[in-house]
Amino acid sequence: QGIRLSDKYNKMLKEIKDFNYTAIYNNEKFKVYRDYVALVIRSIFNTLMKTYDVCNPYKSLDNIDCMKEAYPMLAGDFYKHIKVYSNIQGDNEKYKNKKIYGNIETKEIYAQAIIDYISGMTDRYAVEIFNELLKY
């Protein structure tokens, strides 16, 4: 059956949830923040997705490497992420983890690698990366 609360605590939990929705989730300021976060995440995702080479997934690493001058943090860190979690870099044997992306044979696997990379970011780091995308 799962966890059950007494009527008293169930009512208290409902009041807290109602407050959260009224004061936080449905607040206009939170909507602006939610839109900002969506922009940050989409911008990072789209920038990295442009580096995928459909004809030759191995070339994707070269494409990431070419981005290092414009986006040193983003390119450097994502390059390392791909290197650690895939089989497409020759010297990755020193990393004993499972190579969850294999040879990154498809665009979908590459997209998942990007999603996993972004999901591991702190809010502060994601904003730093986003600011790097804005610099000329």
Identify what each model region corresponds to.
Residues 1-136:
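Histidine-centered, transition-metal-coordinating active-site segments
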